[in-house]
Amino acid sequence: MIRVAATAAALTLLSACGSQPSDVPQTGPNPQLPGQQPSLIPAMKIAKPTGWGDTRPTVPKGFAINAVATDLKVPRQMLVLPNGDLLVAEGKGGHAPKLRPKDVIAGYIKSLGTTSVKGGDRITLLRDADGDGRPELRTTFIGKLDAPYGMALVGNELFVAEQGALKRFDYVPGATSITTPAVVVTRLPSRINHHWTKSLAASADGSKLYVGVGSNSNVGERGMEVEQDRAVVWEIDRQTGAHRAIATGIRNPTALAIEPVTNGLWSVVNERDELGPRLVPDYLTQVRDGAFYGWPYSYYGRNVDPRAHPQRPDLVATAVAPDYALGSHVAALGLSFVTGGGWGGAFSEGAFVGEHGSWNRQDLAGYKVVWVPFAGGRPSGEPRDLVTGFIGPDGKARGRPVGVLYDAPRRALFIADDLSNTVWRVTPAVTTAAAGTGRARG
């Protein structure tokens, strides 16, 4: 381990010798894309954990934030049940072998910014019957799972996307646990599992399920034969399990959600590494049926990646650009649209995005929750920092946001923090008319 650490330090210094412009705008519908800067190893910097202590994340004036659960076991995504119970999926997955020395080094660097807690492989239920932000009940809702991540409820059927299977459970309203056996709707690609998370959403009418399956590599270096059914979004028939890929070349679709105005499917996507600190921006996009988003042959439409082998100019010619850039290497892992008018005012239509934070650029990016305004079902402005403070003044990480979830009946935003193993709750503290311009508070 000492040798790995020393090698990582030396190569990180080497990779930091070059740079790309740091002031190019990289959010919104038309991000500026600098020239490629491939390197032996990417510039790597991770914010080492320090914990929250007696602090908490920072929210704008007019809002309050509190922890509704602590000491979880790697919380990822969440789901609100019709009675207001909050489900939290907890787990760690992935078992991809390291192919190259830089894979070992990158793995070591990334491990410095993660929790030492073992994943719970469970779904925890939090019941806050009076809505005061302090749950009266916390219990294991479903145990003995295999790295659960995405969840969706259709009627009285609860669907859970594990790293290797989509499962269905019978849900009884008001129940505090499920002990009956699951039904496997369909197996999910799990060989190697370079990107293990399986995001999940249900169509607006509940007839279809959508699962996001990430690639098995950064840019195809394991060979394209192991990328079968990877870097795709599957549409799955809820009753039969029959599935098809509705979008391809979408490197790592880490969260899926239905946009409520148009009922369109949207995703946040983690793009590729090792082309420099300003390439390639992660993004938010509508998932279009039949669209090819470029991976691994191109990015942001038809910008060719020379590292992909074999080259496929025929596919590049069909590649579509995503809708909205979030910034390079922010690691967007959470997506939730507001419904019911949201918080009103500037927060009446749009999406919350949880940005887990970078590991492969010298200036840290992400480590926050942003708000993306929408109008008429489309992004309509620049992203706005909403919940910050995950990086302290000393540059260390207090937490790292993953899933985000807006609970319309209670006008609350929940944030899963998998570094401090906390779920946070953001609510209006005063009228939101003043919240749009106020100074941040902790």
List each model region and its residues.
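C-terminal motif of bacterial Sec signal peptides marking the signal peptidase cleavage site
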Residues: 13-16
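Blade-loop segments of beta-propeller domains
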Residues: 97-153
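Conserved beta-propeller blade signature
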Residues: 85-87, 157-160, 208-212, 264-268, ...
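Beta-propeller domain segments
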Residues: 19-59, 97-99, 105, 109-113, ...
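Surface loop/turn motifs at the tips and blade-to-blade linkers of beta-strand repeat domains
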Residues: 67-72, 139-146, 184-192, 245-249, ...
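Short loop/turn segments immediately following the C-termini of beta-strands
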Residues: 83, 91-92, 163-165, 171, ...
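Asp-box/WD-like beta-propeller blade repeats and closely related beta-sheet repeat scaffolds
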Residues: 134-157, 162-203, 215-218, 242
